[in-house]
Amino acid sequence: METAKGSFSLEVMDPDNISGWRDEDPYFGSEKRGKNIILYDWFAMTSKIDSVESLIDKIGFTSDVKFEDTYGFYGYKNRVMFDGMSIHYNHNQKSADYPLIEFTGQGCRDFETYTDGNWWRLFEMALDTENYHVTRLDVAFDDHDGIFDIRNMVMKTLNREYVSKTHKAQIVDSITREVDSWSLQFGVRQSDMYCRVYDKARERGYTDGRHWIRCETVFKDEYALNFIRNKLSLGEKYCGILKNYLRFVEPNKSDSNKRRWKTSKFWDKFLGNCNKVKLYTPKTVDYNLSLSLIHI
């Protein structure tokens, strides 16, 4: 485990040494009790060159893991699955039938538990864009220290006391007989990046009063690839991306421009003075094509 340097008020799991963390219990392991962490929480990638067997081999299991056949998904006819890890495939070899490796949140914990936990083994495959295409990467910050007050964040969102790159925010109020809980979403699911904040303890049904709020960001396609390409530490780039994407602010009645309002203290405590990180890559212009069109 690596403690974030500088102003970061959180602990970051070192992607090369995180074996043993299990997501279903945030208090698993005395050395991790009550720690704020950043972790990978979803990974999906297609391959042009692999079979199911070669993908399983490349995952690099260090203990016996048995994949079981199950029903297909996402238009694939077949799938093998172990806990939260799946490989979707078709028997016929068409260009659109490239096998898809997918880890859910639990699948990411399985990867860290049943291999040496080295995410860069998979990320180096993703960087080979001729043969692989990363379709989704989720990165989550788990707050166990009380940095986030979900009710306060809901109220600030309702009052539009935030500045964001996205034009859409959504508040979901889930009411059951025992509890009610809120979740926030900034951006839409169809976009290449969106952010969710929710009460993970309530979602898991814990009733012992523990504080576990998750801030989860979903990256797709080019955004996922650019996240992997960025050479900053996991904590620096995740916090930097959020700093560029979303900011909660304190209202100032004498200034109508929200962008000049001060950042809320809890958001500053979360992100500190990290530098903003942008994932968007402007499309380059093919000048040869442009010139040829001019002469048509």
PLM region spans:
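Catalytic cores of extracellular degradative/oxidative enzymes
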Residues: 290
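Conserved small/polar residues in nucleotide/adenosyl-binding loops
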Residues: 294-296
